[in-house]
Amino acid sequence: MVYLLISICISSFLFVIFKLFDVLKINTFQAIVVNYFTAAVLGFFLSNNLVSFQEIPDQPWFFGAFLLGIMFILVFNIMALTSQKNGLSVASVSSKMSVVIAIIFGVWYYEESLSLIKLMGIVLALVAVYLTSFKEKNAIVQNNKDFLYPVLLFFGSGAIDTSLKYVETSFVAEGGVPLFSATIFGCAFILGVIVLLYQKIIGSLSFELKSIFGGILLGVPNYFSIVYLLKALSTEGMESSTAFTLNNVGIVILSTLFGLFIFNEKLIRKNWVGISVAVVSILLIMFVNE
């Protein structure tokens, strides 16, 4: 349980860092690219795997890691935009309620059961994402793009969770998770560098030194949030469904508190209802999976 609490705290802190990027005028994409370099280096350095760099492309999970790297950098940027445009609570709920996508995939692909209570949880999660997307009273969102960000984050995060589970269970051998994770971060970094080089060629790139510091600040907790979640999942007696749902509920609540007390974010009644519905939905799903 200690590992899970650490993961919740670190993951919630990621949303705070994204918000600070906006406050300090740090280029979000540049910082995210550096973040993935930092996370990849940490992963390769701390991995005890004897596989050499030359052998990584030959691993059965490499293609999956490459695709996940693309999704990681895309969704991470959407998460940053959602935190900055819609607030911490909207970003956290949109990303963490995407657990319902993994559940639907499990029912379809792994032929897991779908009870009435689980179905209620899925429906309530979708309602929660909608309610927390409201920014002002009596209005959904003044800018349609601002409403689009939470929706993209919801489906993008769900795609990552589902793909991670599929690739890890199908292709990653025991003890290979650190190297697999580091490879995902490395692929995301390479893609980010390609985009930065393109921006340099067309003359739209002005790299800022503070982006490096911002990326390091983001990369270290980003890596360890995954490490401690994996440690929590490997704890004896800790069911994966319980760990994931508790992790999601904790991040939603804690990131909302961060938004309220650190950035003075204002939540209208619909937002509070949405957050409450989110907690109820994920508790229902956890209850079914017990």
Label each residue range with its predicted role.
Residues 20, 30, 90, 113-116, ...:
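Residue-level recognition of membrane-helix boundary sites in multi-pass small-molecule transporters
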Residues 1-66, 76-85, 136-153, 186-235, ...:
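Membrane-interface interhelical linkers
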Residues 1-5, 100-166, 270, 275-290:
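Juxtamembrane helix-loop boundary signature in multi-pass membrane transporters
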Residues 1-11, 55-72, 111-127, 150, ...:
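Structural signature of hydrophobic alpha-helical transmembrane segments
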Residues 157-165, 169, 226-230, 236:
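Extracytoplasmic gate region of multi-pass secondary transporters
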Residues 27, 78-94, 172-178, 229-247:
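Structural motif at transmembrane-helix junctions in multi-pass transporters
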Residues 38-42, 94-108, 123, 187, ...:
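Alpha-helical transmembrane segments of compact multi-pass small-molecule transporters, enriched
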Residues 19, 80, 106-107, 165, ...:
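Small-residue-mediated transmembrane helix hinge/kink sites in multi-pass secondary transporters
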